[in-house]
């Protein structure tokens, strides 16, 4: 007998319902979460046994949107959902990031979280709903999980923070920030902002964390009521004698190796020490597990580096805690691209290009929240050679999609509107070297490449990655972290922005006890680093180039009467197709009569504009046109006079004398001057060849009598 347990609570302006016990009863745990009509069904399956040889924690989070949730049938050929889209991948990462640090070290059992959107209210984003569901399902499952977590979206409208703003409210919000955390700690922040201050950003984080406590309280209450028994799990006991022996063999040498500033040389030295330790220990005792030796060795590395940082010693590459690595900036280095830049910060390097296209190059995104068009694209590629490795090349992985979206958030606030700059813009960041903070290098490179392309961005933006090492009350914030410092630290966060404020903030915290004061110190230190980088960038290029590249399309905009759109398009698109082919341009027409002509030369654009103006021009009574005979009939001839207009030259209006047979005077396709005599109420046009001839003759005689001639 199905006996669901339901819990309902108010969360800001929304009502949230948690329900369990109705569906997916063979899963370890399952929860249906509903927030005002947006419902996400979340399941957790956890393996009781660890796979043999497993040396990492195999947590998988899958997020999938079903078209039926929005009352639609998929538009694909097979009429069913395919592989996850970019949006689904980003939300899966958003859920994964705050959950992963809450599993105890040494827990290696496989866990899969599946979140399926089954109903959607177009005003309520499903990502926060899915995050709440994942937290609830894991908490109910009994697995060793130090949750639950809450999730909240924070907007900033009219100077006030707004909890879980609707889709319409987000359109007018200066902030879109998602924060997740436990009852006592913030774990994850993901945001984009319209150049807000550090204080406003931090205030939003604190506000969201405070407001989400109601979610945590209700999940705890649900667990108390129907939660499964906690697993009887404990970490493997520490082999202290092996720890001591490895420290004896390697501690001093590891410390010396981490004084080598060049990454590849340092890695080679560490690898050599590790291999020697493994060989020595296995020679002493063949029963030892190589995986355990490597794990203890890695822990010793982390301990040594952290102790040096906390003691105030120079960092791995010799820098002080607040120093940014050496910068090298070059722009315009690729001759045929529309804009390019090479941004190098230490051993991290990004080759970034900007390409300008027309409206038809925009990306149409059709998901369960509706269809929308994106005219600014930023793609991030991380090839294996950037870290001196070999590997598979193919479609972008989750990490590349996530880093690209973060970099895009960092630049979005300074991009011009489509009205200010009617181009689709694509930025591509190729990471050619990597040793920490390649996504923030992409922000810097994107800003430089956009300026090089002549895109009128409001101001330069730069990004910086920060780290934190904390033991007890002692903590050190590190600016511009290396890859090793990211791995060994307790918090890493990335801040992008201009001189006037923050455009993007991403934060991942691995420990509890990170206070508001620590985050404030970190944000202030990040601001100093960002301003330093901006200064160097502005010395390379301080404002967008006055002209776009000669290889980029020029977009010219004209306005026509909306009633004339059909004339420019023609039957079956015949007129506009001929226009584009004959002038070598791309023409786009909007419903309000706005016409955008993209051409690589000014002459092409002039030709297209002249043709369109000719087509859409109103026929004037008394004006003489050069027409073309399109049809000959017994009583006269029909003549096209441009603009898709055609008029009749009656047989009596062909010549001054009597005309017996029209074909004696006119042939098909013949070009003749005609004068508009009348346009009747039905729009029919009466033309005259003899009146046109008389008017032209009179004008010629007047001209010859003019003394100036």
UniProtKB/Swiss-Prot annotation:
Its cofactor is Mg(2+). This is Polyribonucleotide nucleotidyltransferase. Component of the RNA degradosome, which is a multiprotein complex involved in RNA processing and mRNA degradation. Mg(2+) binds at residues 486, 492. NCBIfam families: polynuc_phos, PRK11824.1. Residues 690-709 are annotated as: Disordered. GO terms for molecular function: 3'-5'-RNA exonuclease activity; magnesium ion binding; polyribonucleotide nucleotidyltransferase activity; RNA binding. It catalyses: RNA(n+1) + phosphate = RNA(n) + a ribonucleoside 5'-diphosphate. The lineage of its organism: Bacteria, Pseudomonadati, Pseudomonadota, Gammaproteobacteria, Enterobacterales. Its EC number is 2.7.7.8. PANTHER family: POLYRIBONUCLEOTIDE NUCLEOTIDYLTRANSFERASE (PTHR11252), POLYRIBONUCLEOTIDE NUCLEOTIDYLTRANSFERASE 1, MITOCHONDRIAL (PTHR11252:SF0). Involved in mRNA degradation. Catalyzes the phosphorolysis of single-stranded polyribonucleotides processively in the 3'- to 5'-direction. InterPro entries: ExoRNase_PH_dom1, ExoRNase_PH_dom2, ExoRNase_PH_dom2_sf, KH_dom, KH_dom_type_1, KH_dom_type_1_sf, NA-bd_OB-fold, PNPase. Residues 622-690 form the S1 motif domain. Keywords: Cytoplasm, Magnesium, Metal-binding, Nucleotidyltransferase, RNA-binding, Transferase. It comes from the Bacteria. Residues 691-702 have a biased composition (Low complexity). The keyword Magnesium applies. GO terms for biological process: mRNA catabolic process; RNA processing. GO terms for cellular component: cytosol. Belongs to the polyribonucleotide nucleotidyltransferase family. It is found in: Cytoplasm. Residues 553-612 form the KH domain.
């Amino acid at each position: 007998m199905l006996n669901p347990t339901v819990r309902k609570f108010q969360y800001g302006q929304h009502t949230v319902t948690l329900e369990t016990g109705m569906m997916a009863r063979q899963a370890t745990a399952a929860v249906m979460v509903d927030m005002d009509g947006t419902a996400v069904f979340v399941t957790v399956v956890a393996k009781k046994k660890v796979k043999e040889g497993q040396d990492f924690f195999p947590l998988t989070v899958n997020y999938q949107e079903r078209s039926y949730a929005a009352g639609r049938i998929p538009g694909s050929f097979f009429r069913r959902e395919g592989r996850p889209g970019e949006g689904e991948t980003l939300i899966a990462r958003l859920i994964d990031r705050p959950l992963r640090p809450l599993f105890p070290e040494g827990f290696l059992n496989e866990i899969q979280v599946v979140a399926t959107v089954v109903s959607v209210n177009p005003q309520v984003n499903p990502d926060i709903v899915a995050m709440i569901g994942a937290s609830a399902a894991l908490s109910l499952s009994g697995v060793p999980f130090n949750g639950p977590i809450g999730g909240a979206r924070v907007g900033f409208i009219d100077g006030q923070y707004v909890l879980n703003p609707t889709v319409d409210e987000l359109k007018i919000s200066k902030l879109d920030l998602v924060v997740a955390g436990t009852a006592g700690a913030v774990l994850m922040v993901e945001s984009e902002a319209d150049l807000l201050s550090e204080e406003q950003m931090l205030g939003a984080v604190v506000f969201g964390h405070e407001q989400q406590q109601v979610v945590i309280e209700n999940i705890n209450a649900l667990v108390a009521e129907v939660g499964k028994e906690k697993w009887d799990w404990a970490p493997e006991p520490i082999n202290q004698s092996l720890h001591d022996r490895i420290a004896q063999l390697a501690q001093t040498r590891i410390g010396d190796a981490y004084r080598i500033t060049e990454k590849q040389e340092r890695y080679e030295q560490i690898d050599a020490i590790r291999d020697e330790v493994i060989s020595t220990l296995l020679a002493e005792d063949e029963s030892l597990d190589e995986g355990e030796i490597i794990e203890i060795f890695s822990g010793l590395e982390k301990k040594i580096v952290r102790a040096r940082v906390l003691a105030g010693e120079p960092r791995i590459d010799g820098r002080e805690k607040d120093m940014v690595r050496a910068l090298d900036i070059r722009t315009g280095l690729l001759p045929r691209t529309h804009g390019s830049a090479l941004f190098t910060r230490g051993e991290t390097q990004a080759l970034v290009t900007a390409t300008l296209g027309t409206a038809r190059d925009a990306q149409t995104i059709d998901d369960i929240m509706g269809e929308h068009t994106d005219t600014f694209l930023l793609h991030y590629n991380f090839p294996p050679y950037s870290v001196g490795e070999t590997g598979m090349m193919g479609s972008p992985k989750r990490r590349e999609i996530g880093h690209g979206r973060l970099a895009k958030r960092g630049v979005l606030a300074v991009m011009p509107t489509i009205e200010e700059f009617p181009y689709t813009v694509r930025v591509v960041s190729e990471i050619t070297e990597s040793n920490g903070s390649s996504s923030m290098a992409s922000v810097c490179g994107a800003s430089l490449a956009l300026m090089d392309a002549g895109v009128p961005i409001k101001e330069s933006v730069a990004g910086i990655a920060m780290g934190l090492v904390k033991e007890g009350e002692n903590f050190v914030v590190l600016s511009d972290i290396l890859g090793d410092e990211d791995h060994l630290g307790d918090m890493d966060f990335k801040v992008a922005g201009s001189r006037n404020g923050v455009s993007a903030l991403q934060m991942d915290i691995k420990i509890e006890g990170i206070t508001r004061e620590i985050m404030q110190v970190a944000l202030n230190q990040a601001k100093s680093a960002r301003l330093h980088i901006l200064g160097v960038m502005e010395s390379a290029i301080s404002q967008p180039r006055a002209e776009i590249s000669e290889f980029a399309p020029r977009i010219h905009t004209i306005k026509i009467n909306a009633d004339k759109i059909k004339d420019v398009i023609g039957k079956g698109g015949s007129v506009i197709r001929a226009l584009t082919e004959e002038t070598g341009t791309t023409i786009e027409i909007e419903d309000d009569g706005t016409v955008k002509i993209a051409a690589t030369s000014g002459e092409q654009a002039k030709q297209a504009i002249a043709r369109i103006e000719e087509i859409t021009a109103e026929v004037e009574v008394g004006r003489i046109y050069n027409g073309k005979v399109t049809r000959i009939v017994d009583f006269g001839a029909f003549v096209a006079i441009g603009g898709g207009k055609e008029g009749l030259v009656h047989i009596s209006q062909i010549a001054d004398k009597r005309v017996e047979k029209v074909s004696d005077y006119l042939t098909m396709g013949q070009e003749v001057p005609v004068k508009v005599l009348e346009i009747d109420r039905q729009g029919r046009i009466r033309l005259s060849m003899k009146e046109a001839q008389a008017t032209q003759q009179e004008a010629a005689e007047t001209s010859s009598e003019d003394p100036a001639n």
